[in-house]
Each structure stands twice: as C-alpha cells, then as structure tokens.
C-alpha cells in the first residue's frame, strides 16, 4: 500500500499511537511505527470502485458486514503491539468494532500495491493477516495488472489473477468482482 514506509526508532505503545496527530498515517508492526506515504490517484480510484461494489453488495443482502476504507485502524495484536490500516476491509462481527477501530482480524482485506514498497503487501502483511485470523486477503497490483488472492480458511490456497478476470469473494456466497470492468472504467 505505502510506497515508502519509514520506521521510527523507538517502539510505541497504544497510548502513544493514539496521541499521534489525526492527519499522520502510521502503521505499527511489533511495536515499531512506520510512516505511510500518500496513495496515488490510480490507487484511490481502484479503492473507490472496489468499496462501492462491496458496499452495494452488502446493502443488497441486508447483511451485518461493514466495509471500511483506509484510514481505519485494525489492532491485530496487543503483544506484540501491531496496528494496521488496510486499504479496504470487511468486518462481519460487530463486536470487533469499538467506534475507533477494529479489534482483531477483519474477515476480508484488500491492499492496493503502490510501487515504492510492494514487499510490504506481498510478504509482511500477508504473514500478519494469515497468522492473526483474516479469512481472505487480496493484493491488487495495478502496475503488474494482477490480483493475488489468499484464502486463509480451510485449505490454504493462493491464486493469481489478471485484470481480465472475474474473481469470487469467498467470504460471501454469490459475490464476484469483474476486474476487466474496473480496468476499462479506469483505463488501466
């Protein structure tokens, strides 16, 4: 997601994190804070299209799940303290929401890769999301025109799709996202 995560020197606590200015975007991995760069236009355009599709589906089903775009905090661990801001997440357990953040793993996460630091989405976040209980994780890479889907429930499966594909959202029975429509709309 972020092109240049810059680690800060000291470990931070939840209290220190909450004291940061609201306009400062930071993620914390194992107590180390990383500043996040601003996303690009294509990043935000993809985010908007996906959030719109996901939210429309959930509303049409009158479901309990909620869609949240970044910045919205997810505290995935207290020990070690880890808090992330996925580009898009879906939370189906309202008890995880406290008005300020999601406490625990969302059901579904999408990260949109920015060119400066793709390893963060492909490696570090995939590791954290798998280990802390995310059910499904998509990595949307506009530069490579690829979507990597990690299904962390049941038999672990990772599948790569092109932007020409229609992809099933497995946490729902009948939701499919046609990436060729998104690519055409955004001219990517």
Give short role names for the model-derived ranges.
Residues 1-188:
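Gly/Pro/Ser/Thr-rich low-complexity, intrinsically disordered segments predominantly at protein N-termini
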């Amino acid at each position: 997601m972020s092109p240049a995560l810059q680690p800060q020197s000291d470990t931070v606590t939840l209290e220190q994190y909450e004291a940061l200015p609201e306009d400062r975007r930071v993620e914390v991995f194992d107590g180390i804070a990383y500043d996040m760069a601003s996303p690009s236009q294509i990043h935000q355009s993809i985010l908007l299209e996906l959030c719109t599709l996901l939210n429309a589906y959930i509303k049409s089903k009158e479901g309990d799940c909620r869609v949240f775009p970044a910045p919205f905090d997810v505290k995935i661990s207290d020990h070690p303290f880890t808090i992330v801001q996925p580009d898009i997440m879906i939370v189906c357990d309202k008890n995880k929401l406290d008005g300020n953040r999601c406490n625990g793993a969302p059901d579904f996460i999408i990260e949109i890769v920015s060119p400066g630091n793709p390893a963060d989405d492909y490696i570090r976040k995939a590791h954290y999301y798998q280990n802390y209980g995310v059910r499904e994780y998509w990595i949307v890479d506009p530069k490579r025109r690829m979507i990597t889907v990690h299904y962390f429930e049941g038999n672990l499966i990772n599948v790569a799709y092109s932007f020409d594909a229609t992809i099933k959202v497995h946490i729902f029975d009948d939701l499919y996202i046609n990436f060729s429509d998104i690519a055409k709309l955004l001219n990517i």
